[in-house]
Amino acid sequence: MNTKILSKDKDPMGAAILDYQKSGKAGRLRVLSSMFEEDEMPVKHLFRKVEEMPMLEQKALQLAKGRVLDIGAGSGCHTLTLQEKGLEVKAIDISPLSCEAMKLRGVKDAECINLFDEHLETGFDTILLLMNGTGIAGKIENLPTLFNRLKALLNQDGQILIDSSDLKYIYENEDGSFDINLNGAYYGEVDYQMIYKDVKGDRFDWLYVDFPLLKSIAETCGLHGELAAEGEHYDYLARFF
């Protein structure tokens, strides 16, 4: 896996987050994909308070304990909630603009660093990967590398809290059957590109994965897994330890 961070001219989400932090408003954050129609991400949603968060995120924050690593922390909404509870939290993101916004918001330890950078400190009791945490793997084949890296960052009795969704509902017919090409790429592998004002990000791979498959891959890496919570629409929170 690469260890890059984003350049500011290729960081539309970070630009939107910093705009909103500084002015209380932001333009349209457009989300493009070769698989779906163009969508828009409400930037205000990235600044949600704990009571505005989906149930799965609230559950993850309840389960967090000890020293916490928040991966892909974005605007820092999860980190700030845990800080207020008195936990020691390190927030990391590959977006320098997001990290700037987090510091302005009061995140005590925000670092612009890639998860796979060897200089990232270790020794965490809880690792959080929220807002479809499996996404950063990009492809199914990269999940073992991701899990092994997370294991290396954990303390002996630590836990990984990660959420995702099973995209099979996209292929569901009215009779309840599914039109999934079993010979093609895994159906949860998608691609996205984001645009904010004149800032155009590079296209990137993103992974949604069903829990049984995620659990089986984690087990090959020596991790035990359990379903911590299920959402209302094929989404779930998993806990690995």
Language-model segments: which ranges?
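N-terminal auxiliary segments of SAM/dcSAM-dependent transferases
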Residues: 1-30
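Conserved SAM/SAH-binding loop
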Residues: 75
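A short SAM/SAH-binding and catalytic strip from SAM-dependent methyltransferases
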Residues: 124-144
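Conserved SAM/SAH-binding beta-strand->alpha-helix loop
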Residues: 95-96
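A short glycine-rich, Lys/Arg-flanked "PGG" loop and its adjoining helix->strand segment in the class I
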Residues: 143-156
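Conserved SAM-binding strand-loop segment of SAM-dependent methyltransferases
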Residues: 106-117
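Conserved alpha-helix/loop element of class I SAM-dependent methyltransferases that forms part
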Residues: 43, 47-67
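SAM-dependent methyltransferase
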Residues: 7, 19, 156-213
